[in-house]
UniProtKB/Swiss-Prot annotation:
<comment type="pathway">
    <text>Amine and polyamine biosynthesis; putrescine biosynthesis via agmatine pathway; putrescine from agmatine: step 1/1.</text>
</comment>
<feature type="binding site">
    <location>
        <position position="187"/>
    </location>
    <ligand>
        <name>Mn(2+) 1</name>
    </ligand>
</feature>
<protein>
    <recommendedName>
        <fullName>Arginase 2, chloroplastic/mitochondrial</fullName>
        <ecNumber>3.5.3.1</ecNumber>
        <ecNumber>3.5.3.11</ecNumber>
    </recommendedName>
</protein>
<dbReference type="GO" id="GO:0005829">
    <property type="term" value="C:cytosol"/>
</dbReference>
<keyword id="KW-0150">Chloroplast</keyword>
<dbReference type="GO" id="GO:0009446">
    <property type="term" value="P:putrescine biosynthetic process"/>
</dbReference>
<dbReference type="GO" id="GO:0008783">
    <property type="term" value="F:agmatinase activity"/>
</dbReference>
<dbReference type="GO" id="GO:0009570">
    <property type="term" value="C:chloroplast stroma"/>
</dbReference>
<feature type="binding site">
    <location>
        <begin position="189"/>
        <end position="193"/>
    </location>
    <ligand>
        <name>substrate</name>
    </ligand>
</feature>
<keyword id="KW-0479">Metal-binding</keyword>
<dbReference type="InterPro" id="IPR023696">
    <property type="entry name" value="Ureohydrolase_dom_sf"/>
</dbReference>
<feature type="binding site">
    <location>
        <position position="189"/>
    </location>
    <ligand>
        <name>Mn(2+) 2</name>
    </ligand>
</feature>
<feature type="binding site">
    <location>
        <position position="191"/>
    </location>
    <ligand>
        <name>Mn(2+) 1</name>
    </ligand>
</feature>
<feature type="binding site">
    <location>
        <position position="187"/>
    </location>
    <ligand>
        <name>Mn(2+) 2</name>
    </ligand>
</feature>
<keyword id="KW-0056">Arginine metabolism</keyword>
<dbReference type="Pfam" id="PF00491">
    <property type="entry name" value="Arginase"/>
</dbReference>
<dbReference type="InterPro" id="IPR006035">
    <property type="entry name" value="Ureohydrolase"/>
</dbReference>
């Protein structure tokens, strides 16, 4: 397993420094051709996987909505540690590790491809090694999500990766469906800075980008316990409904009986694993004590009324997990229950 330094510069970032240096010495036209080929190959891979899974689900029949698992191993927009880039394979392994059965709490069988199908990962690192910038990389993520959604009845459930991926995913869902969605965002942080540390695509700025783009009508943020003046001002600017942990006992009944998505294109759920108290999830980059319990989150998810059209689970950091990968199991459980909620 790769190790990360005190400020979160992972070993693999040093490994790709040499290719970037080499690229700068090549003619621009040659570099652009190489970038186009890698991006085209990535999109073709996602397209063909989605087609295969979509055809299988349609052949079996009886599904109105099927959860399609898509990994986005992106971590360089994190402000601290970049370990979330390593998360997707750990979460997949935990889903199917055999230590628990494959039936969700709502009684759905994950081995049924009509409930959960997997279309693989976007090869983020390979794309970045070609010198592709974040503007274009985010478009690749959005286009990949749209390719999945083209294969009805597939709906995207994305494994991050840091929270910056939520912006291109929500953008794709909204654009593909033709209008805004309502978002339930569970997190210790509001992630709504205009530009955190100057980074337009920072994981701490993803929901500012979403709201600026008009991709959400309502944004409900639950579990917040690390928020400053800018976070509150940005929340007011965009009309965000921010529910902080200090008032959770008062808000609990309402949050466990949410009804979202009426009058818009559906509901999107974004779960940052650090919404949980660190006692329930040690494998995150930012420890924020005083968070939600795992059952708190499941009660909110299970009782939510609305058509779930997309979701993500982000910010699991395998580099900070316990020796027995307990937080991987936590992230996997989120994926399992979201898949049950989305499929029908």
């Amino acid at each position: 397993m790769w190790k990360i330094g005190q400020r979160g510069v992972p070993y693999f970032q040093r490994l790709i420094a040499a290719p970037f240096t080499t690229l700068r010495s090549l003619p621009t036209s040659l570099v652009e051709t190489g970038q186009n080929r890698v991006i085209d190959a990535s999109l073709t891979l996602i397209r063909e996987r989605a087609k295969l899974k979509g055809e299988l689900v349609r052949l079996i029949g009886g599904a109105k909505a099927t959860t399609a698992l898509l990994g986005v191993p992106l971590g360089h927009n994190s402000s601290f540690l970049e370990g979330p880039a390593l998360a997707p394979p750990h979460v997949r392994e935990a889903i199917w590790c055999g230590s628990t059965n494959s039936t969700t709490e709502e009684g759905k069988e994950l081995k049924d491809p009509r409930v959960l199908s997997d279309v693989g990962d976007i090869p983020v690192q390979e794309i970045r090694e070609m010198g592709v910038d974040d503007d274009r990389l985010m478009k690749v993520v959005s286009e990949s999500v749209k390719l999945v959604m083209e294969e009805e009845p597939l709906r995207p459930l994305v494994i991050g990766g840091d929270h910056s991926i939520s912006y291109p995913v929500v953008r794709a869902v909204s654009e593909k469906l033709g209008g805004p969605v309502d978002i339930l965002h569970l997190d210790a942080h509001p992630d709504i800075y205009d530009r955190f540390e100057g980074n337009y695509y920072s994981h701490a700025s993803s929901f500012a980008r979403i709201m600026e783009g008009g991709y959400a009508r309502r944004l409900l943020q639950v579990g917040i316990r690390s928020i400053n003046k800018e976070g509150r001002e940005q929340g007011k600017r965009f009309g965000v409904e921010q529910y902080e942990m200090r008032t959770f006992s008062k808000d609990r009944q309402m949050l466990e009986n949410l009804k979202l998505g009426e009058g818009v294109k559906g509901v999107y759920i974004s779960i940052d694993v650090d919404c949980l108290d660190p006692g329930f999830a040690h494998g995150v980059s930012h420890f924020e004590p005083g968070g939600l319990s795992f059952r708190d989150v499941l009660n909110i998810l299970h009782n939510l009324q609305g058509d779930l059209v997309g979701a993500d689970v982000v910010e699991y950091n395998p580099q900070r997990d316990t020796a027995d990968d307990m937080t991987a199991m936590v992230a996997a459980k989120f994926v399992r229950e979201l898949a049950a909620k989305m499929s029908k």
